[in-house]
A protein has these predicted regions:
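Active-site acidic/histidine clusters and adjacent loop/turn architecture
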Residues: 1-46, 50, 122, 128-134, ...
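Short aromatic loop motif centered on NTY/YTY
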Residues: 81-144
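Residues that act as N-cap/strand-start positions at coil-to-secondary-structure junctions
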Residues: 29-31, 62, 108-110
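Sec/Tat-exported extracytoplasmic proteins
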Residues: 11-14, 18, 22, 72, ...
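Short, surface-exposed charged micro-motifs
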Residues: 34-36, 65-67, 113-115
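Long, charged/polar, surface-exposed segments that mediate recognition or autoinhibition
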Residues: 43-53, 59-100
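Extracellular/periplasmic catalytic domains that process cell-envelope and extracellular macromolecules
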Residues: 38-40, 59-60, 117-118
Length: 145
């Protein structure tokens, strides 16, 4: 399963960093890994957050989302996740841009800038990659239901 590969990559990276980090008195990096899970019917949702940075700088953050149907041994697409809530990706795009406007953020240009997941409260959540005023994209996490 794809999630096992991702978790194994993180484990290998942490072991490698740990091996190279002695002595700890001069270690200047921070690693943060966290995850949440939710189960709905036969589907397991996992949200994995990774953050890395030097003590004196900002973090580089990445979010990874998995929706695994263990009954069919398959992963769900964003449109399938939206379908669990009786919605389609057109509705998702409209809701995301409405929420971004309320926050004063730039709208996303298409559904390719959105990743869907289900949080531990079984709410449909969007990770929208919106344009930063400083350049580049950043994630805005939006609860849609």
């Amino acid at each position: 399963v794809n999630i096992n590969n991702e978790i194994d990559k993180l484990r290998v990276a942490l072991v490698k960093e740990h091996t190279a980090s002695a002595p700890l008195s001069s270690y200047d990096k921070q690693f943060k890994y966290s995850y949440t899970t939710a189960v709905y019917k036969d589907i397991v949702f996992v949200s994995l957050n990774t953050s890395y940075g030097l003590w004196a700088s900002e973090y580089i953050t990445a979010n990874h989302y998995y929706a695994y149907d263990y009954k069919t041994d398959s992963t769900l697409s964003d449109s399938q996740i939206a379908g669990l809530f009786g919605q389609d990706m057109g509705w998702v795009l409209k809701q995301v841009n409405s929420a971004l406007a309320a926050l004063g953020a730039e709208p996303v240009t298409g559904v390719d800038k959105i990743e869907l997941f289900v949080n531990e409260d079984l709410k449909l959540v969007a990770d929208a990659k919106t344009e930063s005023v400083m350049g580049g994209d950043y994630s805005e996490i939006l609860v849609l239901t």
